[in-house]
Design a protein with these regions (language model features):
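Long, low-complexity intrinsically disordered regions enriched in Ser/Thr, Asp/Glu, Pro/Gly
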Residues: 2, 15, 158-159
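Mixed-charge, low-complexity intrinsically disordered regions
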Residues: 4, 24-27
Length: 162
C-alpha cells in the first residue's frame, strides 16, 4: 500500500508546483486595459490616464507618459496686450513624465500622469512678461511593464491670438 501513496504524493506535489508557476506566469503579463488623454488644461498641461492589468498583488510598476510637444511663448505687456510686433518663440521637443504605481489585490493599477509644455528661455523686456500662447501634443503614448499604448490624436489649445 505504501508504494501507491508515494507516486500519488509526488504527483500531487508536481501539480501544485505547476499550478503555482502558472499563476505567476499569468500575473506577470502587464497590459493596458485603457489609455486616454485630456486637455491641454488652462496651464497647457496634458493629463494622460491609464489602467493596467496583469500585475501581481501589491506590485509596483513604473509608468511613463510621453509625447512630442510644440509650445509658442510671447511677451505681453502689463496692460494685458501684445505689442504690434511681439517678441515670441516656438519650442518643440519630446516631453515625458513618470511615476511609480502599486497594484491592489486585483493586480490592476489606474493612474494619471501630467505632461507639461516644453520649457522656453524667452526673456521679455521690462514691463512685459512671458505667457504661453499655444501648445500642441502629438504621438502621445504611455508605457509600463513592457507594454505600450498609443493614444491617437493631436491635443491642442490656443490661449491668445497674436
Amino acid at each position: 500500500m505504501r508504494s501507491h501513496r508515494r507516486p500519488t504524493t509526488v504527483l500531487v506535489a508536481a501539480l501544485i508546483a505547476i499550478l503555482a508557476f502558472a499563476a505567476v506566469a499569468v500575473a506577470a503579463n502587464p497590459h493596458f486595459l485603457r489609455a486616454s488623454a485630456s486637455g491641454p488644461d488652462r496651464n497647457g498641461e496634458l493629463s494622460v490616464n491609464f489602467k493596467i492589468a496583469g500585475l501581481g498583488d501589491n506590485e509596483t510598476i513604473t509608468v511613463t507618459a510621453s509625447a512630442d510637444a510644440t509650445a509658442v511663448y510671447a511677451c505681453r505687456n502689463n496692460g494685458g496686450n501684445f505689442p504690434s510686433d511681439p517678441k515670441k518663440t516656438e519650442v518643440s521637443g519630446p516631453v515625458s513624465a513618470s511615476g511609480d504605481f502599486t497594484s491592489g489585490r486585483n493586480g490592476q493599477v489606474s493612474g494619471s500622469l501630467t505632461l507639461s509644455p516644453p520649457a522656453t528661455t524667452l526673456s521679455c523686456p521690462g514691463g512685459q512678461r512671458r505667457v504661453l500662447v499655444s501648445v500642441s501634443y502629438s504621438n502621445v503614448e504611455v508605457t509600463g511593464g513592457g507594454d505600450t499604448a498609443a493614444i491617437p490624436g493631436t491635443f491642442s489649445r490656443v490661449f491668445f491670438d497674436i
